[in-house]
Amino acid sequence: MAGAVPDNIDKPAYTGAPPPSGLSADEQHAYDQLAFFYKHGLAFAQEMGNRPQTLYGIEDSPIGLASWILDHDARSYALITRIFAGQEEGLTRDDILDNITLYWLSNTAVSSARLYWENKLGFFSPKHVAIPVAVSVFPDEIYAAPRSWAEGAYPKLIHYNKLDKGGHFAAWEQPQLFSEEVRAGFRPLRK
């Protein structure tokens, strides 16, 4: 979740330093997930954040595009490997191949990578959002934001829920769950 990682967590996780003492079990778990991402999954984000227009291999070759999508970080690779092995993960092999085809036929792989360039790094750092915010924590996301971090980053937190399944592409992987969470998140705003 963007904007919720406290500085005293983000910096040590990024540099490989030990975590601060006194973390709750949820905070320690999130710290470990962030440290893993920084060590094993950040290179693709850095490339797209710094030089998205140099990713010609994903525009010029359907195999290059498939390779980039299927193996851009260790957690996504593990999820896709389980799906291609026939395990139920909310997505099917056809869903993944359809997604690759959509990027290929619309020629939007590099333009979609520009989102990283436009946002640069520091993506996880607090942004001090002052409007009502709803947070849904999916277990296979890059990190599972603890309630304490969400409350610190979003003073007007109106909904927080930890779910049993779903990941970085929750709306795609678990559309029913995602829809239910959107409804639950906006429900407190209805008058």
Please describe what each predicted stretch is.
Residues 1-55:
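A catalytic-pocket lid/entrance helix-loop region that shapes and gates access to the active site
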Residues 46-191:
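C-terminal subdomain of alpha/beta-hydrolase-fold enzymes, centered on the catalytic histidine
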